């Protein structure tokens, strides 16, 4: 439940108590929870070469909160491709860091899991010992990669698609403007509060 709902609440450490298969299941549940069951289902239908029914299009319309059926299948394809691109970039950048401490295959799996977890804002990790990313707190590359995945994943697919189509802020939809403004404000306020209340050196 925690994985699908991407709440990050766990009673046991994922790395210490789950096998590779168990970790893969958790990663899959996180991905499904982040994308949405409907988007994943439509993606599987498209991968099988079948047509999406009217009922399926209605479900996607409600799940993605769009106003029209026009371009619905293209929208789902864009969502899936966007997810693959962001998480793929996260895997490559994370691997550059994890490969310094783990064997290549293990580092690759950690990178894949970490990118899925970060982009979907799930809070899970497979580093063991409930350490999360504490051992890598001084790694600028990994921290920037993780923050980037979390922020872009939090913005949402529709906002990112809107930005890709309308490069100027004033041309964006009201929804995108509100999301971007709120995100920027929360990041700024959170940063200033941490600086003011915590013993940090930056």
State where each predicted segment sits.
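Membrane-proximal intracellular helices of multi-pass ion channels
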Residues: 1-202
